């Protein structure tokens, strides 16, 4: 029986250049996502001098900014962090759907790993739980996914 070749990404951020796209809407949540993600990446060897922080108004602007950053060729990966909280109108559904699709499109179009840390929550309590409380920190999870994907892509 032959041996299966396995490709896996190591969680080593040394030498990488990363762009972080973070929304200003719901910044009391987003700042916790950013803090957790940057702490995680630094603990895994990322030099903070190699991080470019891009602050944008909200989730709807994320695809455009991620696409521009990916096309620049300056970064190994992008981290998209934000929080959209459901209100009383369908606006939530449109913003979440288009932001998600657009971020995925930028990732695929440019073969650029993008850590997807856009919270889409029904209420503030859910957002708080996902930004470092009961449900962990989704910014950390997005950073880990981005890092592992960068290292996998290097081997393909």
Swiss-Prot record:
Domain of life: Bacteria
GO cellular component, one term: cytosol
Binding site for 5-amino-6-(D-ribitylamino)uracil: 25, 59-61, 83-85, 116
Keywords: Riboflavin biosynthesis, Transferase
GO molecular function terms listed in the Swiss-Prot or TrEMBL record: 6,7-dimethyl-8-ribityllumazine synthase activity
GO BP term, pick one: riboflavin biosynthetic process
Family in the record: Belongs to the DMRL synthase family.
HAMAP family: Lumazine_synth (MF_00178)
This protein's name: 6,7-dimethyl-8-ribityllumazine synthase
Species the sequence originates in: Desulfovibrio desulfuricans (strain ATCC 27774 / DSM 6949 / MB)
């Amino acid at each position: 029986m032959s041996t299966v070749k396995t490709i896996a990404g190591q969680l080593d951020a040394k030498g990488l250049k990363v762009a972080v796209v973070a929304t200003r809407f719901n910044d009391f949540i987003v700042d916790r996502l950013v803090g957790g993600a940057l702490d995680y990446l630094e603990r895994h060897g990322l030099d903070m001098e190699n991080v470019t922080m891009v602050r944008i108004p909200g989730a709807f602007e994320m695809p455009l900014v991620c696409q521009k950053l990916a096309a620049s060729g300056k970064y190994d990966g992008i981290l998209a962090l934000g929080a959209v909280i459901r209100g009383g109108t369908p606006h939530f559904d449109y913003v979440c759907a288009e932001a998600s699709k657009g971020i995925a499109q930028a990732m695929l179009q440019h073969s650029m790993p993008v850590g997807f840390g856009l919270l889409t929550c029904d209420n503030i309590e859910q957002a708080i739980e996902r930004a470092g409380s009961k449900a962990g920190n989704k910014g950390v999870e997005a950073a880990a996914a981005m890092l592992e994907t960068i290292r996998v892509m290097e081997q393909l």
